[in-house]
Amino acid sequence: MIGIDIVSIARVERCVKRFKMKFLERFLSPSEILLCRDKSSTIAGFFALKEACSKALQVGIGKELSFLDMCISKSPKNAPLITLSKEKMNYFNIQSLSASISHDAGFAIAVVVVS
């Protein structure tokens, strides 16, 4: 399955400015927050990536999958990687996840392929 999501970077900037860490902690782990380094485009990309993953799994964010069930990291070449907890990998019967994030014209877009 494939999931895709697009997020306005300006909207993320407004949320960070208004809600500070409370906004980030709602959908990012401490290690993911460190990866973002307060960069709005990266935060928007990470949000889009988690939303795209939930769409690829056809469940959205809710009872079956929370933002914190997904973990974003970077490959040695700085490409985004997304993983799920072992429990969720088994629950959804996932063998692998592939991810891509791009930024342009004030938007962050992410795609996740689940196999």
From Swiss-Prot:
GO terms for biological process: fatty acid biosynthetic process. Signal peptide: none annotated. It catalyses: apo-[ACP] + CoA = holo-[ACP] + adenosine 3',5'-bisphosphate + H(+). It is found in: Cytoplasm. It is an enzyme of class 2 (transferase). One of its GO terms (molecular function) is magnesium ion binding. One of its GO terms (cellular component) is cytoplasm. The keyword Oxidoreductase does not apply. This is Holo-[acyl-carrier-protein] synthase. It comes from Helicobacter acinonychis (strain Sheeba). The gene is acpS.
